[in-house]
Amino acid sequence: MPDILHAFPIAVIPARVFAGVTTPAGLDEWWTKRSAGKPAVGAEYELWFGPEYDWRARVTRCDPGSEFELEMTRADKDWQGTRVRFQLAPKDGGTWVEFAHTGWAAANEHYRISCCCWAMYLRILRRYLEHGESVPYEKRLDV
């Protein structure tokens, strides 16, 4: 199975990165249009990207400040059952982020598009956390 992997620094402490990838307020700044959920193993997240993209995920790993993983339970068929994981470690006064989107059935067109989109979204996450920049949802693909 192919995976999407990214590793990069963010110049803020792990607790801030964790909040950025687990809280609805954080997620809505860089990934979702609207979200709901709490960072606790077994909790459900609502991930809304528009009327045709009203997805759900279940928290499968949660260690505050260091790890968070969602398993997609209602999503596009290519995303169904995949897992999105953030592993965080302190580094040089900031955070080293290891991102993984695992469980893809095939390296198909949707996988290839998602590889590119994740790089873009993770860059938006970094700019949001480091500089407070907010990119409206409709303009995120242009970043």
PLM regions with names:
Residues 3-7, 44, 54, 67, ...:
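Intrinsic-disorder/low-complexity, polar/charged segments enriched in Ser/Thr/Lys/Arg/Asp/Glu/Gln
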Residues 74-125, 136-138:
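Beta-strand/loop substructures that line and gate deep hydrophobic ligand-binding cavities in soluble
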Residues 8, 56-61, 82-90:
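Hydrophobic/aromatic beta-strand elements that line small-molecule binding cavities or substrate pockets
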Residues 28-29, 34-74:
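Glycine-rich portal/gate segments that line the openings of hydrophobic small-molecule binding cavities
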Residues 1, 50-52, 77-79:
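Glycine-centered tight beta-turn/hairpin loop motif at sheet-sheet or coil-to-beta transitions
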Residues 1-36:
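Hydrophobic ligand-binding cavity/cleft-lining segments
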Residues 17-21, 27, 45, 59, ...:
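Hydrophobic pocket/interface hotspot
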Residues 127-143:
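Short, highly charged C-terminal tails/helix-capping segments
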